[in-house]
């Protein structure tokens, strides 16, 4: 299963796939996020605001996929995490990624503002009043077969029932947005992510897979190599992968 999740993570890193994922999950296929308006940003983080270099043995944090999306109206970071099984700490993990990204942004603001901030509040904050953080949106794509039964909010990782109600209202929340592949409508997707989702939704039945392939033979015949490889990995179709490699060897 680790190999499958690693493959899915690499696939989501493609700009056209990440854009299609957001459009299909959030906008019913409307092309709101354009791949051409996505640019690469840092995926690796050091924790905290310290400028000190971390120890070589320290573990670095890496997002599955993140790109900056810009248009004439806004600039926002779009991230995605792939999960092949429910994860009990996923709200905290996504929050940790977001905090690490905001910390990176603050380090940059502090660096470019060094020596320029004169007022007391700005000097103390190491941030000008006109400086702003870039917002982050993160979605979790769950491609497991069992229903998601893990927390979707930070509060669901806590025991809050006995806490004073006024204090309870002041506990900060962090919510994640989980999209189960089994529940997605593949027609909302325009790239070959459509075929990947369509086939994975039918992975429990070889007959249904064959029916889907016959029905969508035209699109499948034009499927790119990366998606073909992904389908072979996700559906454990080693024989198809072997056939493709043999075909390439023979020219």
Question: What function would you assign to each model-found segment?
Answer:
Residues 1-251:
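Elongated, amphipathic alpha-helical interaction scaffolds
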């Amino acid at each position: 299963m680790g190999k499958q999740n690693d493959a899915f993570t690499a696939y989501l890193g493609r700009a056209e796939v990440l854009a299609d994922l957001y459009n299909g999950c959030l906008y019913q296929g409307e092309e709101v996020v354009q791949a051409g308006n996505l640019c690469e940003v840092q995926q690796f983080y050091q924790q905290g605001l310290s400028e000190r270099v971390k120890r070589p043995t320290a573990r670095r944090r890496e997002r599955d996929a993140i790109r900056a999306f810009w248009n004439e109206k806004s600039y926002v970071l779009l991230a995605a995490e792939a999960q092949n099984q429910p994860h009990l700490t996923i709200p905290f993990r996504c929050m940790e990624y977001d905090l690490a990204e905001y910390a990176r942004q603050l380090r940059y603001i502090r660096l470019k503002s060094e020596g320029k901030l004169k007022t007391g509040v700005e000097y103390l904050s190491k941030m000008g009043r006109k400086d702003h953080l870039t917002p982050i949106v993160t979605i979790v794509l769950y491609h497991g077969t069992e229903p998601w039964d893990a927390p979707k909010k930070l509060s669901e990782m806590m025991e809050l029932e006995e806490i004073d109600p006024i204090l309870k209202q002041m506990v900060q929340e962090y919510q994640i947005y989980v999209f189960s592949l089994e529940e997605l409508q593949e027609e909302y997707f325009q790239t070959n992510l459509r075929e990947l989702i369509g086939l994975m939704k039918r992975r429990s039945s070889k007959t249904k897979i064959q029916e889907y392939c016959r029905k969508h033979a035209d699109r499948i015949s034009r499927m790119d190599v990366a998606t073909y490889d992904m389908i072979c990995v996700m559906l454990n179709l080693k024989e198809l992968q072997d056939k493709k490699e043999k075909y390439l060897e023979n020219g």
